[in-house]
Amino acid sequence: MKRIVLLLATLGICCWAGAQEHLKFKNIPIDGSKKAFVEALCQNEFHLVNDGDFGAALSGRFTGKTVDVFVMPTSEGITSRVAVNYPSPDNWGNLRLDFYTLLRSLSFKYGEPVELSQEFQLPFSDGDGRELEALRRGRARWYARFVSPEGTIHLVIANNPMTQQPAINLLYEDALNCRRQDELNSQDL
């Protein structure tokens, strides 16, 4: 009898672990081949800009803005991460407003962030008129991290490497597929 109970408990745990869902982007699970994920985004009015072994770049509308999206697969070709790069606004007020709008929306969906930083380093401060300069010089940290059972979402204001202007970036990391990549990497270490 004990063996039957133990077997049923083990099967229940295995079924529960296998039932964990994937993080979603645009209501599309961050899973499956890069090609299939990109095709699903293209059906959601995104346009493929570039596709390569290390990922795919797309352009489209997200949260009311035209953004660049990068789909990143594991070494096995399974989609594991999606990055969103927003356009650089022309002033600090608009950038801060966009950050707070996304922070509020993400908090509504995923709960309060597990990590939140909104700070400037001396000699810069919020309200001094030099906030964008502080961000360009790496003297500010505006960041939030949300964690759910399905994965992690990072919201950050960072310098856009193409324009050298501060902009908002989002990174969605699927827990299951990132864990699988970590397991594969650990075999090499």
State where each predicted segment sits.
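Sec-dependent N-terminal signal peptides
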Residues: I4-W16
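Generic marker of residues within folded, mature protein domains
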Residues: L7-A9, R61, R136
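Non-cytosolic coordination micro-motifs
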Residues: Q20-D53, P87-L189
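A sensor for short, sequence-defined functional sites
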Residues: L41, L58-S59
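Hydrophobic beta-strand residues in large extracellular and virion-surface proteins
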Residues: L58, V69-V71, V82, I153-I157, ...
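Mid-chain, structured segments of secreted extracytoplasmic proteins
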Residues: G60-S105
